[in-house]
Amino acid sequence: MKKLLEYLIKAIVDHPDKVKIDEKNLGEESSIKIRVHPDDMGKVIGKGGKIIKAIRRMAYILAIKKKKRLILELNES
């Protein structure tokens, strides 16, 4: 899941070298923290939050297939 999210987010942003994704698996729960350059926050969030909602939806579907609960956070680095 980490590789897919990294690929998608790096394709959107202007500073792909500043994208960092940390994934922690805690039994039935996965926590993913995405960090991007402050200038790229708007691009990742998208108009009305459409981009980040689509990314979250896709990540949640993958988590459901693995029978895990997912926590996804987006922060500036």
Regions found by a protein language model. Give the residues of each.
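Residue-level recognition of oxygen-bearing side chains
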Residues: 50
